[in-house]
Amino acid sequence: MAAAPVLLLAAAAAVVVVAMVLRWLLLLGGPAAGRLGKRALMPPGSTGLPLIGETLRLISAYKTPNPEPFIDERVARHGGVFTTHVFGERTVFSADPAFNRLLLAAEGRAVHSSYPSSIATLLGARSLLLTRGAAHKRLHSLTLTRLGRPASPPLLAHIDRLVLATMRQWEPAATVRLMDEAKKITFNLTVKQLVSIEPGPWTESLRREYVKLIDGFFSIPFPLANLLPFTTYGQALKARKKVADALREVIKKRMEEKAENGGSIGDDEGKKEKKDMVEELLEAEGGSFSEEEMVDFCLSLLVAGYETTSVLMTLAVKFLTETPAALAELKEEHANIRDMKGKKQPLEWSDYKSMPFTQCVINETLRVGNIISGVFRRANTDIHYKDYTIPKGCKIFASFRAVHLNNEHYENARTFNPWRWQINNKLQNAVGANIFTPFGGGPRLCPGYELARVVVSIFLHHLVTRFSWEETEEDRLVFFPTTRTLKGYPINLRLLSESIC
């Protein structure tokens, strides 16, 4: 009996190996391989070793603070668009802003988004990330309706309260892993936006399962993973079910409430405050969204809100700490804002619009940190670019990082310099030239990008006006499987004597 799990694991591994061998043989001899084999038409490059290609080199590079050589060396040899072989298939990499613009704009026509099967299974087929065409447009529009209006006074007040509630746990001094604290803020904020539930035992229980789900995104999706709960992916599948069940229970209850009220949430003020994403879904298109569509959609928004914004908050503090002049200027900007307000008065939209240097810091953190290093697409048809033809079915990676850190586009591109964004129209020009795409672009432009800026701005305001801090130990950035600091950025915090927190 004790040998059973081992035998199952061995069988699963054998299935994976056989599948990879068959895939490789098909690439060499199948119909699509006829097009792929015409090397003169494909962008130049190297496919590396059989089966694994250059995957190990890519992972090795992205597990260091300096992954640039992987792309830089190939760009130097082959140009801004080159071919490699990673994660089981031949892939075209683009460090060319013009080609990246084409790929982002062509979503749903010449290309479609493509992600590893591990991510697809854990998010659900009806998630915002994976839907295409009219279905994606429908969900994207709804997300914009809810998340694209950060100027809402109730939302700003809630963000302010949530940030302060977290920071009060640090008084009068504390040692924290800043990334963990930031993730608590972004998770609780996203849950509030989705289902109107305040932080408490329910949200903390959900967050613990959610962390396990996230861990499975870049693990190996063994065919028998549901029978192998001791693997990272198996644990992620179990956590996914628990998160989905918790969301489903809330959605069912809200559907019942809506039915009892004759299809309306009612007119009293308390119910109007419950106008969250679930309510938007229940009212949209005559209530045509199914229960499972709503579960997948809400789960995918948890991913978007939880991971990226919390990393942005952490990296902003890390980069500021390493750049004292920038930190001093940021402190001055926020001290001036606080001096003009009552001591305990929450921030308002006009305050947010009075943070120009803060926006420079956020822009530069996005550019240098590259929380989203790029996006994968798959060709729906043969794509002709310059002298190359990328065949239908080929995977393409548009690298934002390679563009953001290119000295041809930014002077001393790998140096954190928020003052570069003070130049007139710098942001507009960079976006227009497609050399600044931290939130993607085209039909899949991140619908919550402005909300993310607001959250980070409010967080930085309260941090610099209430606390001093210092790093407790050296921490470094890594970029695989996602952008993060290796140790969660541990810092010592001390409440300022004049703070009103």
From Swiss-Prot:
GO molecular function: fatty acid 2-hydroxylase activity; heme binding; iron ion binding
Binding residues annotated for heme, in chain numbering: 446
Main location: membrane
Pfam family, one: p450
PROSITE patterns noted in UniProt: CYTOCHROME_P450
EC numbers, comma separated: 1.14.99.-
UniProt KW Transmembrane keyword: yes
Keyword field: Heme, Iron, Membrane, Metal-binding, Monooxygenase, Oxidoreductase, Transmembrane, Transmembrane helix
Location of the protein in the cell: Membrane
Gene Ontology biological process terms in this record: brassinosteroid biosynthetic process; brassinosteroid homeostasis; sterol metabolic process
Enzyme class: oxidoreductase
Pathway assignment: Plant hormone biosynthesis; brassinosteroid biosynthesis
Co-factor requirement: heme
UniProt cross-references to InterPro entries, sorted A to Z: Cyt_P450 (IPR001128), Cyt_P450_CS (IPR017972), Cyt_P450_E_grp-I (IPR002401), Cyt_P450_sf (IPR036396)
Membrane-spanning ranges: 2-22
Gene Ontology CC annotations of this record: membrane
Topology of this chain in the membrane: Single-pass membrane protein
Domain of life (superkingdom): Eukaryota
Stated family: Belongs to the cytochrome P450 family.
Entry-linked PANTHER family: 3BETA,22ALPHA-DIHYDROXYSTEROID 3-DEHYDROGENASE, CYTOCHROME P450 26
Cited function: Catalyzes the C23-alpha-hydroxylation step in brassinosteroid biosynthesis. Converts 6-deoxocathasterone (6-deoxoCT) to 6-deoxoteasterone (6-deoxoTE) in the late C6-oxidation pathway and cathasterone (CT) to teasterone (TE) in the early C6-oxidation pathway of brassinolide (BL) biosynthesis.
Protein name per Swiss-Prot or TrEMBL: Cytochrome P450 90A3
